[in-house]
């Protein structure tokens, strides 16, 4: 039997949406969780079969949370539509709590014909280890069915507004900080789920051939260490990668460089007054403006040391040399990536699936030449 679409959604009030789907990372007083869901067949051209809105209170019993309400509703719905594979999409104001995440993971394991994509406006108790583990199990890619979880960007907020809000023809108006908050939450989710980079993305963007062209993206991998008894101890909860935000993508009209996205993220970690070492591995060295902002950061945070390893030197025919010298003068360690740094990034940040790092032709020669060029740039500050 071919199911038919049933429009059972009572649209959400615009003020309710704007208030509850605020993507400010840290919010208090919003105790209601909203879940907007859409069910389709896996045929991408097919129309929605059903749509619902669920709500619940974060501090109520788990059975009253919207995720559990969805599971009960979908169990009944599935009995009438058991002969096909379905794609379920959620837009939620808070990501699932531990118990709900575990229940959803169990549901997906029992019904492999259902795929679930979860777009979240905010992360709920993301700093708690049990919560982190529950989300990793829910989104685990290997070993069985899993959910795909993403942070809502401008497009998802707009889609949710168009599908579930009584906007009366008015377009979605994003908050001013939506892009910045998106970047923070996306990086945090990447840390939490331990996202890894596609091998092709790494080899394409971190190739240190001097004649590379057409690479307009900057990737930045990072790790954080804390000094304890004269030993640098890795803080694996603050390890990941991000890239620049291109213009007009995710609500950034002018775009935002990867280094600035990274600087936005650091205060979110709430590092205390102990000594920390932050190491960045970048596909391009910082431009003048980013170098200035990074220099300002280390000047204002003397307990944090910064090391930057770049695959290539970004030469915009502008003041990039001046920026690198200022960054170096203010205490940052700047060097070109060599074989050991490329291998470390491959082993740490790439979904290599057991494959060892394979250097490209000329890697060592290019690294030596770039190191000499960088050395000349930095030494010029003393001339």
Swiss-Prot record:
SUPFAM superfamilies xref list: Cytidine deaminase-like (SSF53927)
GO cellular component: cytoplasm; nucleus; P-body; ribonucleoprotein complex
Modified residues (Phosphothreonine): 32, 218
Broad class of the protein's primary localization: cytoplasm
Catalytic activity: a 2'-deoxycytidine in single-stranded DNA + H2O + H(+) = a 2'-deoxyuridine in single-stranded DNA + NH4(+)
Active site: 259 (proton donor)
Necessary for homooligomerization: annotated segments: 209-335
GO molecular function, one term: cytidine deaminase activity
Activity regulation info: (Microbial infection) Antiviral activity is neutralized by the SIV (SIV-mac) virion infectivity factor (VIF), that prevents its incorporation into progeny virions by both inhibiting its translation and/or by inducing its ubiquitination and subsequent degradation by the 26S proteasome.
Compartment(s) of residence: Cytoplasm; Nucleus; Cytoplasm, P-body
CDD domains referenced in this protein's UniProt entry, alphabetically: cytidine_deaminase (cd01283)
Gene3D superfamilies with a match to the protein in the record: Cytidine Deaminase, domain 2
Domain of life assignment: Eukaryota
Binding sites annotated in the UniProt record for Zn(2+) 2: 257, 287, 290
Homology family: Belongs to the cytidine and deoxycytidylate deaminase family.
Assembly description: Homodimer. Homooligomer. Can bind RNA to form ribonucleoprotein complexes of high-molecular-mass (HMM) or low-molecular-mass (LMM). HMM is inactive and heterogeneous in protein composition because of binding nonselectively to cellular RNAs, which in turn are associated with variety of cellular proteins. The LMM form which is enzymatically active has few or no RNAs associated. Its ability to form homooligomer is distinct from its ability to assemble into HMM. Interacts with APOBEC3B, APOBEC3F, MOV10, AGO2, EIF4E, EIF4ENIF1, DCP2 and DDX6 in an RNA-dependent manner.
Protein name: DNA dC->dU-editing enzyme APOBEC-3G
Organism: Macaca mulatta
Annotated gene: APOBEC3G
């Amino acid at each position: 039997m071919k199911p038919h679409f049933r429009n059972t959604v009572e649209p959400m009030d615009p003020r309710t949406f704007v208030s509850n789907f605020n993507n400010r990372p840290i919010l208090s007083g919003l105790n209601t969780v909203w879940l907007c869901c859409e069910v389709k067949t896996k045929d991408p051209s097919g129309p929605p079969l059903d749509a619902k809105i669920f709500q619940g209170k974060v501090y109520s019993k788990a059975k009253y949370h919207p995720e559990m309400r969805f599971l009960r509703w979908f169990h009944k719905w599935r009995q009438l539509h058991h002969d096909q594979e379905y794609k379920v999409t959620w837009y939620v104001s808070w990501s699932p709590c531990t118990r709900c995440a575990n229940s959803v993971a169990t549901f997906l394991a029992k019904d492999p014909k259902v795929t679930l994509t979860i777009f979240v406006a905010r992360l709920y108790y993301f700093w708690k280890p049990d919560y982190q583990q529950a989300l990793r199990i829910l989104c685990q890619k290997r070993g069985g069915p899993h959910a795909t979880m993403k942070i809502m960007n401008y497009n998802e907020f707009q889609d949710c507004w168009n599908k579930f809000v009584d906007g009366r023809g008015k377009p979605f108006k994003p908050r001013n900080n939506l892009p910045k908050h998106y970047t923070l939450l996306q990086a945090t989710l990447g840390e939490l789920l331990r996202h890894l980079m596609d091998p092709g993305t790494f080899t394409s963007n971190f190739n240190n051939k001097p004649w590379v062209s057409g690479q307009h993206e900057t990737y930045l991998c990072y790790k954080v260490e804390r000094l304890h008894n004269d030993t640098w101890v890795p803080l694996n909860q603050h390890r990941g990668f991000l890239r620049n935000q291109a213009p007009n993508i995710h609500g950034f009209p002018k775009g935002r460089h990867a280094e600035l996205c990274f600087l936005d993220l650091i205060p979110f970690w709430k590092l205390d007054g102990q000594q920390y070492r932050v190491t960045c591995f970048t596909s391009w060295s910082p431009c003048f403006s980013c170098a200035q902002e990074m220099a300002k950061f280390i000047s204002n945070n003397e307990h944090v040391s910064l090391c930057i390893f770049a695959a290539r030197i970004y030469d915009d025919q502008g003041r990039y040399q001046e920026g690198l010298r200022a960054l170096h003068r203010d205490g940052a360690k700047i060097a070109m990536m060599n074989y050991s740094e490329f291998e470390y990034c491959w082993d740490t940040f790439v979904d290599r699936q057991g494959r060892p790092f394979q250097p490209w032709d000329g890697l060592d020669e290019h690294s030596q030449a770039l190191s000499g060029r960088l050395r000349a740039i930095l030494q010029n500050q003393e001339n």
